């Protein structure tokens, strides 16, 4: 996948102008191939920037985690910089965990926007267990329509877009070449296994324990699996798990990319109380408790 050149960027901008001034449809395939290519390349390059810091032999990992010179802060900022520069040429504004959070009065009229977490999984990063991710999503009218999750330490890429399906592939960390994609859910991922719930084995909230107890009544052989950061949503999208209850606080940038991938894989991400789909670019950027299934 090639990084956008000037002509391609011009084409994207022209599409957006035509869409605003005519009946020209921005959803033609070449337009969205361009967009997905943009965010995949942004995620890959941001992941490389993170790994340069993660593997740096001279950094002090004892520094306070959010100090300006901590590895976490350096990686977060560098990833954000790479992504912001890549998305600057697109027609849409950016809402990022690391960037400035604009007041709702400025955001409420945004028809489409990027929602980004440049380094999701701070605990995983600090523990050096490799389960941190780069998350980029395109949200239109509150719905995630395109998303990319890159796991740079494991060289694994996930992406999905509305109407086009969801996929995963391995990435060459040296060249950033994306290997042969596999469609999600993975063929045979649910064959011959027990019903699986994504949850922390060691830090279950009382509400999650109750939720799992209720599930056991219907699935006595229930099995729990765990993963870091947005990889929890990917497990359900892959078909390696059946349900992920998140009965604890999260922010929109924690879930937007995974939500897009889950939707493209035929899954649902629902408010645990109302059973309605999660929405984005809300006045309050906190998510309600939710369930992925």
Describe these PLM feature segments.
Residues 137-233, 282-293:
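Acidic beta-strand-loop-alpha-helix segment within the catalytic core
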Residues 31-119, 175, 190, 210-213, ...:
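N-terminal subdomain of lithium-sensitive/metallo-dependent phosphomonoesterases centered on the IMPase/IPPase/PAP
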Residues 2-10:
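Extreme N-terminal basic, low-complexity initiation segments
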